[in-house]
């Protein structure tokens, strides 16, 4: 009897392991195993996982690309690997966020135009300062270096009793006096030129007046004289009097007195 009972107990654990859902002790034994716990968790995550529709579309695109790759390899083209790489790069680039690049401002450089003629090193080497003068001669441009004296000092600084004093230099005073004299000479020259112009205008007016007077005298002579240089008789008697006025030149704008005292008279003509 003891042998039969022992054999029965030996069969019990095998049945429990094969049928874990039978009885309350089998339920505890099932959860005590780590493999069963992990499998249950994986099953739960697979059932509860949610897939976004955007990801589904991307998966569909990948499947289409894979199909085209397989078709290309079947046709015998060698560009299947290259196409797959390009497709993967395209998907990676599309997923990566685009960086906004700011437009770079165009920097414009201003070119400074130097004055003509350019500075010469040989001219700068001398002690006396020089200037360059340009002029045209026979249709050519001539550049000439001219010596220029150094500008005079206007102020002279001196230190006395811990103070700095500024005094006008003698050169500056002399230069100011020379400038004043030069200005006075210019004014005198302008005044003299104006006087000469006025005198010339007066002389021209006098000459015009003299010409007009001479024309009037000639007209009067033509009216009072008839014939070729004949003697005329006056009212006083049979005396022959030549009452023809004498013509004189006007010198220095002075009119002859005889012409002023002469009066028009009536004459009898004899034939």
UniProtKB/Swiss-Prot annotation:
Q: Where is this region: Disordered?
A: 174-255
Tissue-by-tissue expression: Expressed in the shoot apex, stamens, anthers and young siliques. Detected in provascular and vascular tissue.
Domain of life of the organism in this record?
Eukaryota
Q: Where is the composition biased (Basic residues)?
A: 237-247
Biased-composition ranges, Acidic residues, are: 177-224
One Pfam family this chain carries? Answer: FAF
Q: Where is the FAF domain?
A: 114-168
Q: Which residues form a coiled coil?
A: none
Among InterPro entries, the record links this protein to: FAF (IPR021410), FAF_dom (IPR046431)
The chain's disulfide connectivity reads none
Role this protein plays = Able to repress WUS when constitutively overexpressed, but have no effect on CLV3.
Q: Give the family from UniProt.
A: Belongs to the fantastic four family.
This protein is called Protein FANTASTIC FOUR 1
Organism of origin = Arabidopsis thaliana
Provide the organism lineage as a comma list: Eukaryota, Viridiplantae, Streptophyta, Embryophyta, Tracheophyta
């Amino acid at each position: 009897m003891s042998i039969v009972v022992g054999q029965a107990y030996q069969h019990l654990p095998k049945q429990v392991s094969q049928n874990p859902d039978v009885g309350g002790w089998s339920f505890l034994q099932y959860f005590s195993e780590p493999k069963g716990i992990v499998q249950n968790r994986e099953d739960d995550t697979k059932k509860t996982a949610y897939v976004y529709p955007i990801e589904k579309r991307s998966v569909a695109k990948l499947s289409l690309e894979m199909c085209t790759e397989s078709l290309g390899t079947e046709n015998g083209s060698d560009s299947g690997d290259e196409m797959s790489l390009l497709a993967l790069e395209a998907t990676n680039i599309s997923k990566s966020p685009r960086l906004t690049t700011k437009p770079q401002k165009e920097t414009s450089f201003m070119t400074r135009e130097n004055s003509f003629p350019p500075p010469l090193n040989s001219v700068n080497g001398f002690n006396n300062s020089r200037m360059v003068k340009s002029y045209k001669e026979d249709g050519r441009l001539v550049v000439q270096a001219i010596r220029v004296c150094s500008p005079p000092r206007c102020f002279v600084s001196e230190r006395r009793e811990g103070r700095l004093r500024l005094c006008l230099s003698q050169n500056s005073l002399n230069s100011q006096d020379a400038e004043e004299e030069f200005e006075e000479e210019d004014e005198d020259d302008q005044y003299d030129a104006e006087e000469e112009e006025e005198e010339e205008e007066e002389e021209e007016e006098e000459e015009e007046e003299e010409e007009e007077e001479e024309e009037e005298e000639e007209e009067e002579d033509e009216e009072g004289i008839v014939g070729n240089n004949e003697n005329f008789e006056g009212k006083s008697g049979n005396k022959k009097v030549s009452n023809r006025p004498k013509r004189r030149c006007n010198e220095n704008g002075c009119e002859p007195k005889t012409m002023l005292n002469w009066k028009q008279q009536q004459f009898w003509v004899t034939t």
